[in-house]
Amino acid sequence: VTTASSAVARTRPTRAALTWVVVRWRLLPWWLRITVVYALSRVLTTVLMSGFARIQTANSFTVQHPSYLSFASIWDGAWYRVIAATGYPSTLPVDAAGHVTENAWAFMPAYPFTVRALMTVTGASFEFVAVWVSLLAGWGAALVFRRLMGRFLDPTRATFATVLFCVAPVSVMFQVAYAEAMGLLLLLLALLLLVQRRFWTMLPVVLLLGITRPTGLAFSLLMVLFVLVGVLRPALLRMPERLTLRTAVPPTVVAVVSGLVGLAWPAIAWAVTGVPRAYTDTELAWRSSYIGWSELVPFTPWVQGFGWWFRQPAGTILLVVVLVGFAAVVFQPAARRIGLELRLWGVAYLVYLLAVFFPQSSTWRILLPIAPLLGVVALPRSRVYRVATVVLAVVLQWTWLYFCWWVDGYDWTPP
């Protein structure tokens, strides 16, 4: 009895301490809780990346055992470094057959030019500035993501969705020299403004988004779908009445502006190089190492890609299964809790990818913009489920680093 009483007495201070921590945590402002979550998740990713950096051998990007900043600036980071230093080429590089090869025109200008401006002001290195721009943009994206989830989910679910956002397998993008974090911040802000029906305020955000990541056409499609639903089934968008000719003008303007900015970069590449298909041919260069040089035929790249990876007819069958699975997730009754706007964005972005993107090892990174669908993943309240989901995300993050980021000899799986 005495032993049992002593054990109970010893556990009381521990329980009291845990209770105090939980209470204090719940009393913190939502933005401070998200900041803590984001900071802890970035520490975790830093540990994982540093582990790979310690075993990294010399390669075309870095020396053996590079510093964290050097290791975080490889792959596309090398292209952004070139753009920040010298801008874009006026003459496209070509191979012996006359086909355009990989070059800087594949990358939008907002991120590298922002980095260059800050380098000029601070005198800091590209690696330092580029990683910090991504880190701060990722922090902003996490805060906006929580606000966006909070429009549809209760605080607990919204916070858990943000935890998943912070530890997702490709959340590495929040602390490397890539434009994804900056692009995601702008995208989430545009979606939040859409949910708030602040259409005119969306315009500068959409303009910046379109020159940060190639999402202009997809966002334009989202706005077209939004207007159609607003006219035909306004209740699905929580609207008290149908969109009229007058009230449809603001979202229609956003759709037009987003579409134009989506076409602007190919037009700029044409104007600078004198080659009408400079941007398209540059993008095709990246897939030529898989399937050789071929023209872009909309809505065929995924059939080609799945055929290359899995052979036919297995590739096409698997592609159909993937698309049906995506539709099942987006249109299941439970998914209605995150709002039709976010689900329509997932559909619009997937349609855009199906039209132009060739699935390869960077597919996981390219899917980052559908992060708002994590709200569906966050719906179950089971603690076991939530812990298991976070653990799985961290394991997949390590797996992604192993297969896609770490350079292991001749690496053909770029992130």
Regions picked out by a protein language model, each given a short descriptive name:
Residues 99-100, 105, 109, 113, ...:
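Loop-to-helix entry region of an early transmembrane alpha helix in multi-pass inner-membrane enzymes
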Residues 190-201, 381:
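Membrane-interface transmembrane helices that cradle and orient dolichyl/undecaprenyl
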Residues 125-129, 145-167, 342-344:
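Transmembrane-helix signature of polytopic, membrane-embedded enzymes
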Residues 133-136, 152-156, 160-192, 209-219, ...:
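Multi-pass, polyprenyl lipid-linked donor-dependent membrane glycosyltransferases
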Residues 117, 129-152, 325-331:
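Transmembrane-helix motifs of polytopic, lipid-linked glycan transferases
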Residues 41-58, 220-329, 342-346:
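Membrane-lumen/periplasm interface segments of specific transmembrane helices
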Residues 335-357, 366, 389:
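Transmembrane alpha-helix segments characteristic
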Residues 75-93, 97-123, 293-303:
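Short hydrophobic/aromatic helix or loop-helix immediately within or flanking a transmembrane segment
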